[in-house]
Regions:
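Phosphate/pyrophosphate-binding loops at sites that engage ATP/ADP/AMP, CoA/4′-phosphopantetheine
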Residues: 1, 29, 211, 251-264, ...
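Metallocofactor- and cofactor-centric catalytic cores in central/energy metabolism, strongly enriched
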Residues: 2-20, 24, 80-82, 135-142, ...
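Conserved catalytic cysteine-centered active-site region
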Residues: 10-64, 68, 72-107, 115, ...
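Active-site-proximal alpha-helical scaffold in enzymes
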Residues: 41-71, 116-157, 202-209, 256-260, ...
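Glycine-rich anion/phosphate-binding loop at the beta-strand->alpha-helix junction
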Residues: 260, 271-278, 284-342, 346-353, ...
Length: 385
């Protein structure tokens, strides 16, 4: 997964970079892989890669795939403050194959109005959600606090989480010195926390190879259903800002592929960079506000940590632990890139899949999404108001 410093100059490390990260990993493992892939930016990419490699493995095109990523922005920040001299430059040679969509997530017109970053787009979506619910600001702040209190509680019980205080809904919704406004209506503790040190990896293979390599069967987890889809790319052209046809469809396709319903899912890890991402996902998947099932198994990006493009690798790894503890149960992971734009979903269980593993061609669903109505943006509005 692409490192944050390679995504944005804002996060560039003063200590150098690796020119070919997947090859550097392969060298350390004494491996000679057929493919060396390095993603473009997108929080959807870990689940997207799982979906892609599952299909390749099922078709006999790939025997083993390693999906991995890491961020060390906390260590980098601390080392810079301490004036340390560190050399992270590495050139293992060659260039990786890039994968993903590297288009800007915003239009020229949006950029003209300073809409370029997640911390500007997601608050915009949040205010659309509040407007649709006809809530006043105070009531909506309380509702967001209650929602993210659930994530904070999950992080409190997770030894790998970076913020384990177990914040209350009131604390999360109250502006204070350590919970200042970032962009209305989000205070600091409702934002993804990118300044962390975290790494995760997922290994994928077939049942035959797992047996051949002696991987204990109690460790096996199967991908029962999956889907990928992209909403209208330009946020200002979307018909509604409080909806995501792509999330709705990804969940439906993944569940249909597995022959399951939403009621059959024991736990969810919904992409949680900001409250609006979780609220829209819950609505589109059909998870009620008072549903007691987990909506995050890690603690989410604000409390577990938001390691750039790699968060969902952590989601998947932790969901594997969850379903292993409850053999036969099902867990759903959703992933989101850009501004509630690029989506992937996966349904996991220790229960083996039945029959040949086949997924619907993602192009079919994407064609449906691309045919949805779009708003026309008036770049030169007039009027007296």
């Amino acid at each position: 997964l692409e490192f944050f410093p390679d995504v944005s100059p804002r996060f560039a490390s003063p200590f150098g970079r690796c020119s070919n990260p997947p090859k550097a990993v392969a060298n350390r493992l004494a491996a000679a892989p057929r493919q060396l892939l390095y993603t473009h930016s997108g929080g959807n990419m870990p689940q997207y890669l799982v979906n892609r490699f599952a299909e390749e493995i099922a078709n006999g095109e790939t025997e083993l795939a390693l999906i991995c990523g890491a961020e060390l922005l906390r260590s980098t920040q601390n080392a810079r403050k301490a004036g340390l001299k560190i050399d992270h430059n590495e050139d293992p040679g060659g260039e990786p194959t890039r994968i993903g969509d590297n288009r800007f997530g915003f239009s020229d017109e949006e950029a003209r109005h300073e809409l370029r970053a997640a911390i500007h787009f997601y608050p915009l979506l949040e205010n659309a959600i509040r407007g649709g619910l006809k809530r006043d600001v105070a009531s909506h702040m309380t509702a967001m606090g209650r929602l993210f209190e659930r994530l904070a509680a999950a992080a409190k019980d997770n030894p790998l989480a970076t913020r384990r205080e177990g914040y209350s809904a009131e604390r999360l919704a109250t502006i204070s010195d350590d919970n200042r406004w970032i962009c209305f209506p989000y205070p600091r503790l409702m934002n993804s926390n990118a300044i962390i040190d975290q790494a995760a990896a997922v290994l994928m293979t077939s049942v035959g190879k797992a047996r051949e390599w002696g991987i204990p069967q109690e460790r096996w987890v199967f991908l029962h259903g999956c889907a990928d889809g992209t909403d209208t790319w330009v946020v200002s052209e979307r018909e509604r800002l409080d909806a995501s046809p792509a999330i709705r469809g990804c969940a439906r396709i993944a569940l249909d592929m597995a022959g399951k319903s939403v009621a059959d899912v024991a736990a969810f890890d919904l992409y949680s960079c900001f409250p609006s991402a979780v609220e829209v996902a819950m609505k589109e998947i059909g998870i009620a506000d008072d549903d007691p099932r987990p909506i995050s198994v890690t603690g989410g990006l604000p409390f577990f940590g938001g390691p750039g493009n790699n968060y969902v690798t952590h989601s998947i790894a932790e969901m594997m632990n969850v379903v292993r503890k409850r053999p036969g149960s099902f867990g759903m992971v959703t992933a989101n890139g850009n501004y509630l734009t690029k989506h992937s979903a996966g349904l996991y269980s220790t229960e083996p899949t039945k029959g040949p593993w086949r997924r619907e061609d993602p192009k079919k669903f994407q064609t449906e999404l691309d045919a949805l109505p779009k708003q026309r943006v008036n770049t030169k509005p007039g009027g007296t108001g």
